[in-house]
DNA sequence: ATGACTTTAGAACGATCGTTCTGTAAATAA
DNA sequence: TTATTTACAGAACGATCGTTCTAAAGTCAT
C-alpha cells in the first residue's frame, strides 16, 4: 500500500523542532506558536499530528529515549573494558543528548496541573539511561576493574553529573564541554586524594 | 526614626514565596498570579514592591546568592581540613539551596526575550559559589591534602554535581538526598578504581 | 480633625496561551 | 469524472499571562 501523501515527514519535522525547542526553553517556555513557526507549519496543523502539548512532549521524550537506548546498545559492545565503556558513554551522552528532555520531564512532572498518567510515564523515563550506566558499573565490578560498595548511588550520581553537563550544550563551546565530560569520568575513576 | 508601616515585611513575604515558586516551577512556569496567591497579597500589590517579573527574579537571585556567600563565609572557618570543608559545603548547599535559582537563571538567560542587562547580571550569579568551591580545592592543594591538575575544571564539575542534586530537594526524601550529597564528596575524593 | 502620603485590593488592558473550528486544495478511490 | 478522504492554513475561542490603572483604606504629621 503506497502512500503519496508525505504526512509522516511533516510529523517528523514538527517533532524534531519541538524537541529542540523544549530542550532549549523548557516546557512552559515553549509555545505551540513557537513550534509552529520553527517547523514552518500552521499552529492548527500541529494539532493534526499531536493531540495536545503534553502528549506531544511525552511522545518526544519516550521516543527519544527509546532511540537513545537502542543506539547505545548498538555501539556498547565495541568497548571492552568498563573504563572504556564509561568514557564512551560520556561522549555518547554528550552527542546524543536526550538528557535535556529528562530535565524538562522533571519540570512537567513537578507541575500539579500535569495529568497523573503523564507523570507516571515521565518517571519511567530515567530508567533507560540509569540501567545503561548501572550495567557499565556492574560490568566493571565483574571484571575486577572497579570497587563499588553502593552501586545504585554511584549510578545515580554519574547520571546526575552527565545530565547536568548536558545543560551546557547550547551555550558552551563543544571542545571545552567534551573536556568536561572526559574529566568527570576521570574524577569518578580516580578522585583527587593524594596517594 | 521608627516606622509603623510594615511594608518591608510584606515585601519579604512576597520575595520568599516567589523564590520558592521559581525554584519549584521555573521562571516561565511561575505566574505573578501564583505569587500573589501564595503570598496572600493582591497581584497589583506585587507590582508595588517589584517593577516587573524579570526584575523580581533578578533581585531574588542576587540577594539570595549574596546571603548564601555571607553565611558560608561565616561557618567556613569552623572546618579545618579541606576534606572537612568539602563535606561541610555539600551539606551547606543542600540546606541553603540557592542553586535551583541558578538553574532558573539559566532558563531566563537562555530566553531571547530577556533583556541583555538581566542576562549579564545572571551570568555573574555563579561566581559566588564557584569561588567558594575553588577556595576549598585550593586550600586542599596548599595543605597537601589534594592533588589537582585542573583546578577550574574540578571546581566546575563539583559545582555542577551539587547543583544538580539540589534539583531533587522537593521530590526526594531528606535523609536519602543527604546521603547522596555525602557520597558525591566521597567519589570526588577517592574515585572507584581498585588500588 | 485635617490633609498628605503610604500601602493595599481589585478591576481592567492588550497580548499570548493552548485548543478547536472551519474551510480548502490536493490526493485517492469509485 | 465524481466522491471521499487526507493534509494542511488560518480564523476564532475562552483562559490566562504580565502589566497598568483606579481608588479606597491605613498611617502619620500638623
Regions found by a protein language model. Name each.
Chain A
Residues 1, 91-92, 131-143, 159-160, ...:
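C-terminal peripheral helix-coil segments that are non-catalytic and often amphipathic
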Residues 1-25, 30-41, 55:
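Basic, helix-initiating cap at the start of DNA-binding domains
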Residues 39-50:
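Short hydrophobic/aromatic patch on the recognition helix
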Residues 59, 63, 70-99, 154-158:
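Hydrophobic alpha-helical connector segments
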Residues 66-69, 73, 99, 116-143, ...:
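Amphipathic alpha-helical packing segments from all-alpha helical-bundle domains
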Residues 96-117, 170-171:
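Amphipathic alpha-helical segments used for helix-helix packing
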